């Protein structure tokens, strides 16, 4: 069978290894496996959400309310925006896909940081768009400005991942707003706030308020997700917030019922459980200090993280791939950043006992 020729050259996103695969490959008992590779919530899912899912499970034969009225209402109350300014996606990456189908093409490219979330580039290539990247791995707005100034007519979408995955750094909000002021109103600026709950908990200077963003800039799209801080990675629920014109355009690309009945109920309930969110954030930054101290004691380079992970960058004397492979055989799943052309490992911040075991075993490898 023949397929469209461009399909052969499309990159595939490298996700963290699932626990099930490690069990099959190495015969390790599930209870002995620690997965800190995919930035999932180590506290799991809110008990209130689990109870809600159980109660709604009997309705699994029914399609969800495709207006997502109650979820949009909850997000509207949280961010003080109108429901008409919100779109729901099967993970925020689906809305990234919508945005690129709406704005990018073979003549209109995208601008991203040197090292950032891979799906921007992958979805851009789906529509044949050219990728413009900064030389700096971290977000460098001076480079963004220069590349945009030089290629303004050829760039239709700019992605700012704040905080940035997989490095963890985060720009101050005032820097971001200052940058967007210089961007044409016909260029879509996407603020990917998948980890924003963590960033604003650590520093108010990093918080990008969606209401202020879309009131100030008609060309801005804010993305959020329930996969990280809210502990619903397996439910696949994300959202976008923008002015009504952008939301209407994205809705034209959305298939009906793009999240499930159970996912919808889980997200609605998750928004109500502030205690679980608070516990998640407190555990994260308490345990983050353990990793930072380990890195300092062992002369490992790391970038200050405003997320739920930390990235260790190794010098030429260490091999991140070898370290990850050796730990994997012992049931420790971490994220090798080889696919980003980095000799580095990204580690999700787990619970105390998980972190201690991981660092004890990592110590033996370095």
UniProtKB/Swiss-Prot annotation:
Pfam families: Aminotran_1_2. Its cofactor is pyridoxal 5'-phosphate. InterPro entries: Aminotrans_II_pyridoxalP_BS, Aminotransferase_I/II_large, HisP_aminotrans, HistidinolP_aminotransfase, PyrdxlP-dep_Trfase, PyrdxlP-dep_Trfase_major, PyrdxlP-dep_Trfase_small. CDD domains: AAT_like. GO terms for molecular function: histidinol-phosphate transaminase activity; pyridoxal phosphate binding. Keywords: Amino-acid biosynthesis, Aminotransferase, Histidine biosynthesis, Pyridoxal phosphate, Transferase. The modification N6-(pyridoxal phosphate)lysine is found at residue 228. Gene3D superfamilies: Aspartate Aminotransferase, domain 1, Type I PLP-dependent aspartate aminotransferase-like (Major domain). Pathway: Amino-acid biosynthesis; L-histidine biosynthesis; L-histidine from 5-phospho-alpha-D-ribose 1-diphosphate: step 7/9. It comes from the Bacteria. The keyword Ubl conjugation does not apply. The keyword Amino-acid biosynthesis applies. Its EC number is 2.6.1.9. GO terms for biological process: L-histidine biosynthetic process. It is an enzyme of class 2 (transferase). It catalyses: L-histidinol phosphate + 2-oxoglutarate = 3-(imidazol-4-yl)-2-oxopropyl phosphate + L-glutamate. PROSITE patterns: AA_TRANSFER_CLASS_2. Homodimer. HAMAP family: HisC_aminotrans_2. Belongs to the class-II pyridoxal-phosphate-dependent aminotransferase family. Histidinol-phosphate aminotransferase subfamily. This is Histidinol-phosphate aminotransferase. It comes from Campylobacter fetus subsp. fetus (strain 82-40).
């Amino acid at each position: 069978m023949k397929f469209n020729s461009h399909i052969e050259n499309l990159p595939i996103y490298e996700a963290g290894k699932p626990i099930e695969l490690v069990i099959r490959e190495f015969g390790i008992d599930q209870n002995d496996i620690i997965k800190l590779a995919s930035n999932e919530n180590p506290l799991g899912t809110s008990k209130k959400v689990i109870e809600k899912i159980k109660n709604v499970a009997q309705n699994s034969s029914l399609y969800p309310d495709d207006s997502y009225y109650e979820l949009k209402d909850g997000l509207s109350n949280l961010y003080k925006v109108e429901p008409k300014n919100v779109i729901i996606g099967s993970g925020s990456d689906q809305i990234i896909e919508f945005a690129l189908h709406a704005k990018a093409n073979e003549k209109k490219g995208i601008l991203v940081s040197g090292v950032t979330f891979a799906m921007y580039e992958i979805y851009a290539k789906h529509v044949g768009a050219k990728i413009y990247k900064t030389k700096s791995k971290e977000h460098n707005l001076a480079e963004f400005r220069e590349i945009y100034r030089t290629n303004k007519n050829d760039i239709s979408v700019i992605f700012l991942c704040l905080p940035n995955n997989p490095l963890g750094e985060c720009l101050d909000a005032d820097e971001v707003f200052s940058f967007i002021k210089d961007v044409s109103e016909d260029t879509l600026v996407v603020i990917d706030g998948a980890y924003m709950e963590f960033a604003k908990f650590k520093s108010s200077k990093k918080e990008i308020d969606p209401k202020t963003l879309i009131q100030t800039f008609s060309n801005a799209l804010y993305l959020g997700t329930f996969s990280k801080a809210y502990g619903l990675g397996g439910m696949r629920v994300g959202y976008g917030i923008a002015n009504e014109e952008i939301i209407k355009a994205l809705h034209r690309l959305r298939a009906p019922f793009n999240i499930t009945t159970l996912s919808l109920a889980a997200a609605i309930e998750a928004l109500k459980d502030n205690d679980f969110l608070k516990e998640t954030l407190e555990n994260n930054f308490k345990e983050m200090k353990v990793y930072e101290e380990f890195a300092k004691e062992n002369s490992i380079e790391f970038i200050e993280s405003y997320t739920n992970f930390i990235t260790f960058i190794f010098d030429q004397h260490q091999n991140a791939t070898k370290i990850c492979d050796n730990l994997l055989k012992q049931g420790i799943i971490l994220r090798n950043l080889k696919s980003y052309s980095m000799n580095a490992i990204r580690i999700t911040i787990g619970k105390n006992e998980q972190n201690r075991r991981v660092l004890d075993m990592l110590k033996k490898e370095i």
